[in-house]
From Swiss-Prot:
GO molecular function: toxin activity
UniProt name for this protein: U3-lycotoxin-Ls1a
Compartments, as annotated in UniProt: Secreted
Signal sequence, start to end: 1-20
Entry GO terms, CC: extracellular region
Length: 115
């Protein structure tokens, strides 16, 4: 019985070691591929579209604000037949950024008080 238990522990140890080595090999291959893409310049992102500018040419090109990425919002202006798309920040994300800024400022004051 002790022999079976010892054999089982050794088998599990060997299996976990071999699977960890395989994962390391996969990670190394991914890193090499990423480095080659960066060297070629293929991974470089194109320029983003600023807030309130037209994003109809590429709806995923809106810039990031401090915490969140702006969203390309499309609508029909009153009395118009053409769809207009602009990069905008949703209100709930705007409020979350304001709350985060206030919390950051308050944390700075507390740090200043208690040094």
């Amino acid at each position: 019985m002790k022999f079976v238990l010892l054999f089982g522990v050794l088998l599990v140890t060997f299996f976990s070691y071999s699977s960890a080595e395989m994962l390391d090999d996969f990670d190394q291959a991914d890193e090499d591929e990423l480095l080659s893409l960066i060297e070629k310049g293929e991974a470089r992102a194109k320029e983003c579209t600023p807030r309130f500018y037209d994003c109809s040419h590429d709806r995923h090109s809106c810039c990031r604000s401090e915490l969140f990425k702006d969203v390309c919002t499309c609508f029909y202006p009153e009395g118009g037949d053409n769809e207009v798309c602009t990069c905008q920040q949703p209100k709930h994300l705007k409020y979350m950024e304001k709350a985060a800024d206030k919390a950051k400022k308050f944390g700075g004051k507390i740090k200043k008080w208690f040094g």
